[in-house]
């Protein structure tokens, strides 16, 4: 289950970055949103030099799964 519609359309790192920032808007409080936005930005910078297409697809898949887990975690708490 994807956290937001359109997860299956994410193919590039920039699309992933924008998708994850949109996911952050679904989080309950401003503080939590800012925390995860910062984490997304940091991860994007860390992996910005990645050029292996296979590895990029692994990162995209894992990031979407992680976003799903985080959104489900906060939905259960509310």
From Swiss-Prot:
Cystine residue pairs: none
InterPro entries: Complex1_LYR_dom (IPR008011), Complex1_LYR_LYRM9 (IPR045291), Complex_I_LYR (IPR052151)
Similarity section: Belongs to the complex I LYR family. LYRM9 subfamily.
Protein name as catalogued: LYR motif-containing protein 9
Organism for this UniProt entry: Bos taurus
């Amino acid at each position: 289950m994807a956290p937001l519609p359109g997860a299956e359309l994410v193919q590039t790192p920039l699309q992933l970055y924008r998708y994850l920032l949109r996911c952050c808007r679904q989080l309950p409080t401003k503080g939590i949103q800012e925390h995860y936005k910062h984490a997304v930005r940091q991860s994007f910078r860390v992996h910005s030099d990645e050029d292996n297409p296979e590895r990029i697809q692994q990162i995209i898949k894992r990031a979407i799964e992680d976003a799903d887990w985080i959104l489900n975690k906060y939905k259960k708490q509310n």
